[in-house]
A protein has these predicted regions:
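Conserved short alpha-helical segments that host acidic/polar catalytic motifs at enzyme active sites
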Residues: 1-159, 165-234
Length: 234
């Protein structure tokens, strides 16, 4: 059940992760965790991704701590400075460099920083919107449009390999984490079957698919519409 949680006494080391993904190299990712000295408690791709990001989150926090502890500041001040200096794009680049598969995932760190990341092939979809009050990411555009009463062009698509990062102070940035693949391969089944038909692009695509099927259907039924029943796929 999403989100998965990685708890720690340090807020900056705690992580919650949720998303829509299917990784194809879980064996390799699991082995990498073993080689780093970990003993993962689970083999599922969700857990492996959580620990993969968590590992580099720990390293980023430790790096900042090692530099700040020499500044003669007290523990609370050091903790707050670490949270301010956390480089989310940097740790996402390191964590995701060997991932293979389709994913649109969202995470939030205990200190309040949040992020969303889309796979570089564009297999899974992700859309975002933000203004002075809110920042939102969802796998489908109509959900955001309906919730915030927005027009189609107000909601933007997160590009393949791109991350949407929100710092706890409200600063928002878009960062290219992984190089966008030359050939973008969105999941056709997701667009044809799973996606909401109220989306502008999905509606047009489905109408076009129906239009392209018409000649084959007419040929298959031999123009006998009186004895043909048309039905939606349940």
């Amino acid at each position: 059940v999403h989100p998965l949680l990685r708890r720690n006494n340090w807020a900056s080391r705690s992580l919650a992760l949720a998303g829509n993904f299917n990784m194809t190299n879980v064996d390799e990712m699991f082995q990498q965790l073993l080689e780093e000295g970990q003993h993962p408690r689970d083999y599922a791709d969700t857990f492996v991704m959580l620990e993969s990001i968590g590992h580099y989150l720990d390293r980023e926090v430790q790096y900042q701590y090692d530099h700040l502890e020499k500044s003669n500041k007290n523990g609370q001040d050091v903790s707050h400075l670490i949270e301010e200096k956390l480089d989310i794009p940097f740790l996402l680049k390191r964590a995701s460099k060997n991932w293979d598969g389709g994913y649109a995932l969202c995470g939030i760190i205990g200190c309040g920083d949040a992020f969303a990341l889309r796979d570089p092939w564009g297999i899974r979809t992700a859309f975002y919107y933000y203004d002075d009050e809110v920042a939102v990411v969802a796998s489908e555009r109509p959900v955001i449009q309906t919730a915030f009463n927005l027009k189609k062009d107000d909601v933007h698509e997160l590009q393949p390999g791109e991350a949407f990062v929100v710092k706890r102070n409200g600063k928002i940035s878009l960062n290219q984490i992984l190089n966008k693949k030359e050939k973008i391969t969105p999941c056709s089944f997701e667009r044809i079957y799973f996606s909401r038909g109220s989306d502008y692009d999905i509606y047009r695509e489905r109408k076009k698919l129906g239009e392209l099927l018409v000649p084959e259907i007419i040929e298959a039924i031999d123009d006998d519409f009186d004895n043909t029943v048309f039905s939606f796929i349940p």
